[in-house]
Amino acid sequence: MPKEIRWGVAHIFSSPNNTFVHITDITGSETASRVTGGMVVKADHEKPSPYAAMIAAARAAQQAMERGITAIHIKVRAPGGYGPKTPGPGAQAAIRALARSGFIIGRIEDVTPLPHDTIRRPGGRRGRRV
């Protein structure tokens, strides 16, 4: 008898400064695990690295599997808005680590919030005065 497939969603937020891996159930209301790059490395300058993202994703996957999730859809997000529209350096490493950890992979999609016209940066006309 084939084992039952239990779907989850892996929300990967990858900025130039850190990578978050947040695995929820299919509705997104119940968190199975949440790990960041800063939780797995000692030095702050290592937080955005692909290595930190890989370790964070592997740890999140292990915690989610203990809670019974066997298959995941992946949603990748960059800061968007007036920030960078492309994911940071840890996104691809996190996706590869989730695929290697034994999950069945469903869909991979980009959910970066993109403005339809443009967004005015904070700081005003004369800029941020330091």
Curated annotation (Swiss-Prot):
<dbReference type="GO" id="GO:0006412">
    <property type="term" value="P:translation"/>
</dbReference>
<dbReference type="InterPro" id="IPR036967">
    <property type="entry name" value="Ribosomal_uS11_sf"/>
</dbReference>
<keyword id="KW-0699">rRNA-binding</keyword>
<dbReference type="InterPro" id="IPR019961">
    <property type="entry name" value="Ribosomal_uS11_archaeal"/>
</dbReference>
<dbReference type="GO" id="GO:0019843">
    <property type="term" value="F:rRNA binding"/>
</dbReference>
<dbReference type="GO" id="GO:1990904">
    <property type="term" value="C:ribonucleoprotein complex"/>
</dbReference>
<protein>
    <recommendedName>
        <fullName>Small ribosomal subunit protein uS11</fullName>
    </recommendedName>
</protein>
<dbReference type="GO" id="GO:0003735">
    <property type="term" value="F:structural constituent of ribosome"/>
</dbReference>
<keyword id="KW-0689">Ribosomal protein</keyword>
<keyword id="KW-0694">RNA-binding</keyword>
<comment type="similarity">
    <text>Belongs to the universal ribosomal protein uS11 family.</text>
</comment>
<dbReference type="InterPro" id="IPR018102">
    <property type="entry name" value="Ribosomal_uS11_CS"/>
</dbReference>
<comment type="subunit">
    <text>Part of the 30S ribosomal subunit.</text>
</comment>
<comment type="function">
    <text>Located on the platform of the 30S subunit.</text>
</comment>
<dbReference type="InterPro" id="IPR001971">
    <property type="entry name" value="Ribosomal_uS11"/>
</dbReference>
<dbReference type="Pfam" id="PF00411">
    <property type="entry name" value="Ribosomal_S11"/>
</dbReference>
<dbReference type="GO" id="GO:0005840">
    <property type="term" value="C:ribosome"/>
</dbReference>
<keyword id="KW-0687">Ribonucleoprotein</keyword>
